[in-house]
Swiss-Prot record:
Its EC number is 2.7.8.26. HAMAP family: CobS. Belongs to the CobS family. It is a multi-pass membrane protein. It is found in: Cell inner membrane. It catalyses: alpha-ribazole + adenosylcob(III)inamide-GDP = adenosylcob(III)alamin + GMP + H(+); alpha-ribazole 5'-phosphate + adenosylcob(III)inamide-GDP = adenosylcob(III)alamin 5'-phosphate + GMP + H(+). The lineage of its organism: Bacteria, Pseudomonadati, Pseudomonadota, Gammaproteobacteria, Enterobacterales. Its cofactor is Mg(2+). This is Adenosylcobinamide-GDP ribazoletransferase. Keywords: Cell inner membrane, Cell membrane, Cobalamin biosynthesis, Magnesium, Membrane, Transferase, Transmembrane, Transmembrane helix. GO terms for molecular function: adenosylcobinamide-GDP ribazoletransferase activity; cobalamin 5'-phosphate synthase activity. It comes from the Bacteria.
Amino acid sequence: MSKLFWAMLAFISRLPVPSRWSQGLDFEQYSRGIVMFPFIGLILGGVSGLIFILLQSWCGIPLAALFCILALALLTGGFHLDGLADTCDGIFSARRRERMLEIMRDSRLGTHGGLALIFVLLAKILVVSELALRGTPMLAALAAACAAGRGSAVLLMYHHRYARDEGLGNVFIGKVSGRQTCITLGLAVIVATVLLPGMQGLAAMVVTLAAIFILGQLLKRTLGGQTGDTLGAAIELGELIFLLALL
């Protein structure tokens, strides 16, 4: 199980993980690592939250919010943001399904993808700033949001089909069992409620899960399934929705 954790950490982040820590693990086994997603989100969000706390007293809340969101993007190598941009480029092209999937494969950034990146990043910075001004514990909020975003992405894997013939997302989409889905969602809920006691964390988690479930159904209807890009979009939007729900 420890090998799966290190493999997942290296897979969805840019944190330096020695290859020997996940040595001998077959790529096809990665689907079992979905249960690690909330914990990986907890780590990434915790680092981002620490950066916010360290910078807040030095440069103020707005700049601290800017740098903690920038750090989060760098920690993931922009992996999920790229998926968000590609998904929006494809979906909002208003073309046929096959053409949408082709556009999503294009490495060039389109207008809709650019607008989506601007909106999501700016919204995160503004929401983090507002939460801090309201006295929300930001280390806990950011760690919980990242755990919620990654945990809720399992809703786009279970009982969904892969929209393409091949790709990274095929490792998870349609390969996750009901038991793994329940464990992943349960862990995300536990992380959120422990870090944000009372109804605040639980309520934000419920809102996030409902929103991502609806997103998954809309994407399924539009694309005929899910891709690695739509998983990235779900993670980014899940983080934002969780933070918004804390307001």
